[in-house]
Amino acid sequence: MNYSHDNWSAILAHIGKPEELDTSARNAGALTRRREIRDAATLLRLGLAYGPGGMSLREVTAWAQLHDVATLSDVALLKRLRNAADWFGILAAQTLAVRAAVTGCTSGKRLRLVDGTAISAPGGGSAEWRLHMGYDPHTCQFTDFELTDSRDAERLDRFAQTADEIRIADRGFGSRPECIRSLAFGEADYIVRVHWRGLRWLTAEGMRFDMMGFLRGLDCGKNGETTVMIGNSGNKKAGAPFPARLIAVSLPPEKALISKTRLLSENRRKGRVVQAETLEAAGHVLLLTSLPEDEYSAEQVADCYRLRWQIELAFKRLKSLLHLDALRAKEPELAKAWIFANLLAAFLIDDIIQPSLDFPPRSAGSEKKN
């Protein structure tokens, strides 16, 4: 990270004017006094040095004094960063809001991939935070985020819906009928992978739907689909059963073997026995969607779902480039400040490099000759 004053001015230009930052920091309770830190821009600079800058609190204070940024102790910095945690999150959210206004979809459907990742405190052990994010595979940029503790489960309906979107998620999101129902009767469409026993499958008459009978009735190597009703599984929040389109994508023999081998290995490691039906169902990818059959074929739905790997790669970039998986703080508010500062840096990097990615380079053969 370049810590020069010239470089900081360029970064600050992408975030906001100094007076706007002062106002937002004051409203968020991040800048209540200016005795050691003269303005919001300085506070933000210290936060970025601690987060994506990779410095410890003591290193940040030493660097700040050396470069005449601020003079304060590491304890004072800790208190300031804790108070600024929510403000850093607001700045990150504002960066995404500006991006959405610029890159908003004007025609057709917009794909939004959703997923989450766990973040652990220093010392390893169980995860303490979960970062939920939305991602646009067209612009290759994140669109939404929410930070919760590790007990907050994945929800397909976590982010606000728009009428032009198709929300795509893995089967970790396909086990809560109330969340799927929210989209089924909402503005957005959805594609979510499901487990063959993950939901209460019903026929149109309200009888139990025979999932294995459906899969066994498919022609070898062929995809198939049907309409099912999703029951509430005894959860009153899920409401009455609702219809959904179920698509079974048959895996090629070699991929089906890999899927079954992985399933056996994971369960063996956990000391569990795999049911024969579960092993049989592993030869298919089961997708649930609200997209109408007359507009989106089963193959098109499957193609959309296959784009889901892009958000997995985006998470890997966050963890490898900004070391988002190397949380430095244990104290909750300081940890939030560290995570939000890293997210803000990631969003700014995307915005800075995106114009160069959007502009196609001229090939050597296209140069005009004098």
UniProtKB/Swiss-Prot annotation:
Top-level lineage group: Bacteria
Record's keyword annotation contains DNA-binding: yes
InterPro entries reported for this sequence: RNaseH-like_sf, Transpos_IS4, Transposase_11
GO biological process, one term: DNA transposition
GO MF term set: DNA binding; transposase activity
Record keywords: DNA recombination, DNA-binding, Transposable element, Transposition
Pfam families: DDE_Tnp_1 (PF01609)
Its job: Involved in the transposition of the insertion sequence IS186.
Family membership: Belongs to the transposase 11 family.
Stated name of the protein: Putative transposase InsL for insertion sequence element IS186A
